[in-house]
């Protein structure tokens, strides 16, 4: 989660989650208004330059709608429900890892 906090220091990202454990590469789930995947990858990796190489982002899934308690992705204390978020993006993630 430290890597996610580092990425959030870039104002282009509103909310982020890194996915990569047990997978061939890291995908960034991001709430942002930016749509250019190459720009997002570059900006995220700029923030991750002091982290191990395996944390480097190779793909991005963008969502415009913020994650919230109402859509079930945040707890009442505004913590990310990681499992629910993974389930929510399962189809998109499967497509990237095929």
Protein language model annotation of sequence segments:
Residues 1-55, 66, 71:
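AMP-binding/adenylate-forming catalytic core of the ANL superfamily
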Residues 15, 47-98:
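Conserved C-terminal "lid"/linker of ANL adenylate-forming enzymes
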